[in-house]
């Protein structure tokens, strides 16, 4: 099971929170489609800014969009011009005021999405894919991850038949739910077609604090009593 399912979705509520933080009984469908449109727009607008994730919080009168990025300068623009332009577009799209919060990713060399985007960009620039994969592998291990796996598939080096190659270092315990596993995906568009890049990173286990475990025990007792 752990080998097939998306490791992020499998661990929501265990090692990772939700990317959409809101509740609605009547407008659930409308809000869900709006969230998808917002994410697609931001990903296309800032495709070269290393956008890791977009967290959307909804309130009755406004929407908060928290944008986690490795390159905040590109997102902000000169004197905040990009932010103001994006806020206007999102306000038109959602018909509500939108607050755009930029959160910088501290160590992009250890984040799966940033690694996948870096590999895809270098493949588009005609860099040797094996060298690129090995470089990113070493950089991530030096950055502090405990395991990393990189998989690319497509017409590698312009070959007539598509194939896949992967490199792995450390361990990726996909069946361990408390393991902090991140997944990144990006497509490199080349003259021979698209090459898919997938990256898995493992950065240790989620250890619950003593206070949280005591609260959980109390909640279980209260429900069963």
Swiss-Prot record:
Provenance organism: Leptospira borgpetersenii serovar Hardjo-bovis (strain JB197)
Gene3D superfamilies per the UniProt record, alphabetical: 3.30.300.20, Ribosomal protein S3, C-terminal domain (3.30.1140.32)
Example GO BP: translation
Alphabetical list of Pfam families matching this protein: KH_2 (PF07650), Ribosomal_S3_C (PF00189)
InterPro entries linked to this entry: KH_dom, KH_dom-like_a/b, KH_dom_type_2, KH_sf_prok-type, Ribosomal_S3_C_sf, Ribosomal_uS3_bac-typ, Ribosomal_uS3_C, Ribosomal_uS3_CS
Assembly notes: Part of the 30S ribosomal subunit. Forms a tight complex with proteins S10 and S14.
Membrane-spanning parts: none
Sorted UniProt keywords: Ribonucleoprotein, Ribosomal protein, RNA-binding, rRNA-binding
Segments forming domain KH type-2: 38-106
Family in the record: Belongs to the universal ribosomal protein uS3 family.
Function comment: Binds the lower part of the 30S subunit head. Binds mRNA in the 70S ribosome, positioning it for translation.
Protein name according to UniProt: Small ribosomal subunit protein uS3
Gene Ontology CC terms: cytosolic small ribosomal subunit
A GO MF label: rRNA binding
């Amino acid at each position: 099971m752990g080998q097939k399912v998306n490791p992020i979705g499998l661990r929501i509520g265990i090692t990772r929170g939700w990317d959409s933080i809101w509740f609605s009984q009547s407008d659930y469908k409308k809000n869900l489609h709006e969230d998808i449109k917002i994410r697609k727009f931001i990903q296309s607008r800032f495709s070269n800014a290393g956008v890791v994730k977009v967290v959307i919080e909804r309130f009755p009168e406004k929407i908060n969009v928290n944008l986690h990025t490795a390159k905040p300068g590109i997102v902000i623009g000169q004197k905040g011009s990009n932010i103001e332009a994006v806020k206007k577009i999102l306000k038109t799209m959602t018909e509500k005021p939108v607050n755009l919060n930029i959160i910088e990713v501290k160590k992009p060399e250890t984040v799966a999405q940033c690694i996948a985007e870096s590999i895809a960009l270098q493949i588009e620039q005609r860099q040797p894919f094996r060298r690129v994969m090995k470089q990113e592998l070493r950089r991530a291990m030096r950055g502090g991850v405990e395991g990393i796996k990189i998989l690319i598939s497509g017409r590698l080096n312009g070959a007539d038949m598509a194939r896949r190659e992967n490199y792995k270092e450390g361990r990726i315990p996909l069946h361990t739910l408390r393991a902090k596993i991140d997944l990144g995906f990006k497509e490199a568009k080349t003259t021979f077609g698209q090459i898919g890049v997938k990256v898995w990173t493992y950065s240790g286990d989620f250890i619950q604090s003593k206070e949280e475990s005591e609260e959980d025990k109390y909640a279980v007792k209260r429900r069963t009593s």
